[in-house]
Amino acid sequence: TRLVGSEMCIRDRATIDVEGTVKPEERAPHGFEIRLDKIKVLSEPAAPMPLAISKWKLNTSLEANLNNRAIALRNVRERAKFRIQEGVVRGFRDFLYSQGFTEIHTPKIGAKSAEGGANLFRLEYFHRPAVLQQSPQFYKQMMVGVFDRVFETAPVFRAEKHNTKRHLNEYTSLDFEMGYIDGFEDIMAMETGFLQYMIALLKKDYAEELRLLGVTLPNVDKIPTVRFCLLYTSPSP
């Protein structure tokens, strides 16, 4: 343990134990700083960091980021993305629990796809053909007869070649199914309620992460419903 003021060299990313007084500081990232009295080095890195993760942005190539992923994820902005992901899933779960839904967990390996189509990841399952599931749709429909309202948060897999940011081969799907509805408007109302709850939760509990990523969430008071008129034409004589 060294007293502050004595000569001491601390390497970047060393693990330290400090004693001091917490003081407000507007210029600090979290609004406060510690005025040190004592500091103790618990451990030092075995080698210099391959990335400057203490910077605001990594400013590295995608290849360098992925090759050093375990280290790159320690960057404050990289971490913030996973916190936002947590907030979205948390909001989905909390809202549906409040609406009387039951969470289910369905198989992801099956003999056939739940949605049909040919874009499947195929594999061998103990010498028998199988596929990775594209959707929990069949399982949700079965469980609605058990619990009336069910939801799942789980990965789905789609073997589709793409070149856009809006298509992924594997992603976390937020699915729900509900019985005893009068029409699709009931589904839209549930989705609107979730979006309102989730956005309010992110603004409240994940404000720092949103600030780090430069994200401004919209206000979702009411989502407009676009209706189409059905036109009837008499058959030609």
Predicted regions and their residues:
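Single conserved hydrophobic/aromatic residue that forms the stacking wall/gate
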Residues: T1-G5, I10, Y232, P237
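Class II aminoacyl-tRNA synthetase-like tRNA-binding/catalytic domains
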Residues: S6-E7, R11-I181
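Long, highly charged amphipathic alpha-helices
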Residues: G87, G91, M190-Y197
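Metal-assisted phosphate- and nucleotidyl-transfer catalytic regions
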Residues: A114-N119, G193-L230, S234-P235
